Each structure stands twice: as structure tokens, then as C-alpha cells.
Amino acid sequence: MNIEEFTSGLAEKGISLSPRQLEQFELYYDMLVEWNEKINLTSITEKKEVYLKHFYDSITAAFYVDFNQVNTICDVGAGAGFPSLPIKICFPHLHVTIVDSLNKRITFLEKLSEALQLENTTFCHDRAETFGQRKDVRESYDIVTARAVARLSVLSELCLPLVKKNGLFVALKAASAEEELNAGKKAITTLGGELENIHSFKLPIEESDRNIMVIRKIKNTPKKYPRKPGTPNKSPIEG
């Protein structure tokens, strides 16, 4: 996906990028490739691939969720900043918090945010299980996002405790959504969520399957969740 395809593809979905925003994506790409030589951020480094599989793919969440109507986002296990930072570039009013367990990645994200002059971005070096028990952040975000970091039953335990009541947990997944959803139903219900929608589509150009799961927080998460670090992965809430 070249820059023209990227720009026109987003414009078709009602997202118009200014010259400044396009510059931010260019700098994001340059820094991603530069830092990737020092720390492992991504296996995808070819420019057209990054624009399609990282930038465009991240922004697809905004095709189905109206980010103009929310203020706060938390991104769990964002790695090199996906999906939240491409979304932040498109919707500059957002207050974005990223939680990642690897300090090197947090350092990259801080430097990146500074270079892109992104305001209202917070980067936390923490495990999602620990972060989700913090009283100052628990059940405080309009939207919590995660992109392919773990299966849905595990992700729900890491993300739903952070979503405020009536807010959304938005999971960006490749294929196998139905299978994951069946295994994750018990976790979603236990943690106070309810599936609102699954949006299935194909990424342009390469035609690979994508799914965006939108889960509404309808009641408070029981205090015992998330459990201690490692437990959600070892013993997921599955029926």
C-alpha cells in the first residue's frame, strides 16, 4: 500500500489526513525501521507493508467505532504502538495510554511520541494484570484496545477491567474469530462484558481476513480480576 493508496483508502471511509498527519506517519515509519535495528519491534519493515499491515490495519478500528465521540483510550500490549498511535494521529483529541511489559518498547514509544509531537499520550511500563488492579485507572477508559496479543479469553481479563461501565473493549484480530469467541464467551460475561458486534472484512490489496470484535462493558468487573501476572494465560476463564 503506497501513500496515495493509504490516503485514498482512509478518505473513502471518511478519514481525511492533513499534510501534517501524513508527515507524522512518514516519521513514524522512519523511526520504526531505525529502532527496529536496535530492539525487536516488528518483522514487517518494507514501507508498503508497514503502511498496510500496521498503519491502515490499526485504523480499521475507526471504520466501526466512532473515535470522535470518546476521549480516553488504553492500549494493552501495544508493542510498537499499534493500534493506538495510528488512531491517535488520525484523531488528535484522544488521550492515549499504552501499557507494555517491555521497557525498551516503552522507551521507543516515548521517543516516538516526542518526535511526532503527540500530546496527551502516557506510556506505562507494567504488566496488564497489575495495571488493571490500580485504583486510579481501573474502569476509567472509554475504549480499551488490543491487537492480536493473546486469545480472547485471556485478552478479556487483561482489558475489560480497565473499561468504564458502558465503554467498549475493541479487539483487532486476524482470522479464527468465531472459534476464539466461543472459547471467550464465559470470560466476557464473567468480566462484565457483552458482545455487541463482530465486523469481518478483508484487508485491501492482500485480501487477508480481519475481524474487529466490539464488546460493551455492561456491569462492573469483579474485584478479583485481573488475577496475578501470568494466571490469565495459564488458566483462562473458559467454560
UniProtKB/Swiss-Prot annotation:
<dbReference type="GO" id="GO:0005829">
    <property type="term" value="C:cytosol"/>
</dbReference>
<protein>
    <recommendedName>
        <fullName>Ribosomal RNA small subunit methyltransferase G</fullName>
        <ecNumber>2.1.1.-</ecNumber>
    </recommendedName>
</protein>
<feature type="binding site">
    <location>
        <begin position="128"/>
        <end position="129"/>
    </location>
    <ligand>
        <name>S-adenosyl-L-methionine</name>
    </ligand>
</feature>
<keyword id="KW-0949">S-adenosyl-L-methionine</keyword>
<feature type="binding site">
    <location>
        <position position="82"/>
    </location>
    <ligand>
        <name>S-adenosyl-L-methionine</name>
    </ligand>
</feature>
<keyword id="KW-0963">Cytoplasm</keyword>
<feature type="binding site">
    <location>
        <position position="147"/>
    </location>
    <ligand>
        <name>S-adenosyl-L-methionine</name>
    </ligand>
</feature>
<feature type="binding site">
    <location>
        <position position="77"/>
    </location>
    <ligand>
        <name>S-adenosyl-L-methionine</name>
    </ligand>
</feature>
<keyword id="KW-0808">Transferase</keyword>
<dbReference type="InterPro" id="IPR003682">
    <property type="entry name" value="rRNA_ssu_MeTfrase_G"/>
</dbReference>
<comment type="function">
    <text>Specifically methylates the N7 position of guanine in position 535 of 16S rRNA.</text>
</comment>
<keyword id="KW-0698">rRNA processing</keyword>
<comment type="similarity">
    <text>Belongs to the methyltransferase superfamily. RNA methyltransferase RsmG family.</text>
</comment>
<dbReference type="GO" id="GO:0070043">
    <property type="term" value="F:rRNA (guanine-N7-)-methyltransferase activity"/>
</dbReference>
<dbReference type="Pfam" id="PF02527">
    <property type="entry name" value="GidB"/>
</dbReference>
<keyword id="KW-0489">Methyltransferase</keyword>
<dbReference type="InterPro" id="IPR029063">
    <property type="entry name" value="SAM-dependent_MTases_sf"/>
</dbReference>
<feature type="region of interest" description="Disordered">
    <location>
        <begin position="219"/>
        <end position="239"/>
    </location>
</feature>
